[in-house]
Amino acid sequence: MTLPAILLLSGIILLGAYLLYGKYVFEKFNINDKNQTPSHQYKDGVDYVPSKPIVVLGHHFASIAGAGPIVGPIIAVTFGWIPAIIWILVGGIFFGAVHDLGSMIASMRNQGKSIGTIIKNNIGYKGKQLFMIFSFSTLILVIAVFADIIAKTFINNPGVASASILFIGLAVVFGTVNKFVADKKSLFIIISIIGVALMYYFVYLGMQIPFALNYELWLYILLAYAFIASVTPVSLLLQPRDYLNSFLLYGLIIFATIGIFYANPEIKMDTQVNITSENLGYLFPVLFVTIACGAISGFHSLVASGTTSKQIDKEGDAKVVGFGGMLIESFLAIISVAAVIILSREEYASSLSLKGPVTMFSDGLGSMMATLGIPEQMAVSFVALTVSAFALTTLDTCTRLARFTLQEYFEGAENPVGKQLSGNRYLSTGIVVVLSILLIRSGGFTTLWPIFGSANQLLAALALLAIAVWLININVNATFVLIPMFFMFTVTLTSLGIFAWKNFQEEAYVLSIIAAILFVLSIILIILAKKSLEQKPPIPEIGNSFK
């Protein structure tokens, strides 16, 4: 099979899944535009802001994508490109899309609150607090790691820093103008075209005016930006920046697809399936943990139930944003695999070791895009900049999500400190930023990062658990959620067990203990969920009832 044929077949499968399986899932969730969404019910102009579906899709897609659907699939090709593609398609359709949409709808039916609150309402208060501590700790780790990555990227490539600063300025102007445009569709289209054109121009301009600072300064600037992006109205900075940035990824996908069809490069990699890898371990569970965002990722549930659910204008918009957004990401993951299977197995192994996944992705797609007449160096730089731009999106979105998590944890607290943390977004964001700085300064984030893959997929399993219990409690057959849930628990518990034992043998006791704690946490939440189902009979959903 040729590379264009693989891409075409994958696209047809994903589109068909949206139209066919998507329809079944939409009916199971009883998505109804007559239901009032949290963005209208709790509209505050800061976090709850009803927005156009294309804008929310841009925010959501930019937030969940990042480098995840690029790095994970490329590393997973170690086990063979055929199992990688199969899991991307099967996982994206039956696991990831259901997980993302389910998290979004469950949140919208629970005042736009996070998975933690859904756990509290359906499993119990203890379950909520445990989940909140876990998700908050994970978000602080992600903020620290990405602040470090972006600061180093800006040092190594000052042009990316310049372009990123220009993007932020453009986003603020776009967000301000968009407020005055309101519901005038034609004017919105015009400012979108101008905004996207300027953004692509700023890619070029940024490279011409590199902006260089030292690591320490970039670190504090980035976290100051993350603070501002977390407390300002979502429609002023975060949402328009993500919306405009999403067109970088759309452009990347379009140019890459055309380039692959036009170049029709030979697939040099063999079809061998490796059950084990010396560096990674066994295909099960490593493949399913490594591909992550390309098929299913727990981080998506935090975004879907955190920022996105508060911006959905009508429930029907969640179809394309939640279910459709995941399938687009799966297609990007297929493109990532395509970018490296034009290499032989030996060339792939060597490049993965020496260059890393992002450079391999940039070089592979850049060479194919160059066949369209685009200078190869420019094409490679464009791909690399696109990936870097989305790292900044992950940073600011995670800061806002961590703020939501901290506020929800103390929601209903009667003591003065708890009330302040729950009600004051400036104080809660300040704590998030300070904790992130402390983790960076300690250097502990480099020690903890290896466990993120397993922790991320555990988040997915726990989100599916919360969605399943919620559905069962409101008399809905949750089999389509339970099957992915059981599989993801099997994957994550196996992965955590292996990870704990391996690090114990290597005397990396901190990682071993953390893995064991996460293993126990998941068991406790499963037991709490089982007890909650045994203790209370199914009840009809209040407000937005299912048929």
Where are these regions (language model features)?
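Extracellular loop-to-transmembrane helix junctions
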Residues: 2-19, 76-107, 116, 161-171, ...
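Flexible loop linkers connecting adjacent transmembrane helices
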Residues: 23-49, 75, 85, 89, ...
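Membrane-interface helix-loop-helix modules in multi-pass membrane proteins
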Residues: 49-110, 121-125, 142-156, 320-347, ...
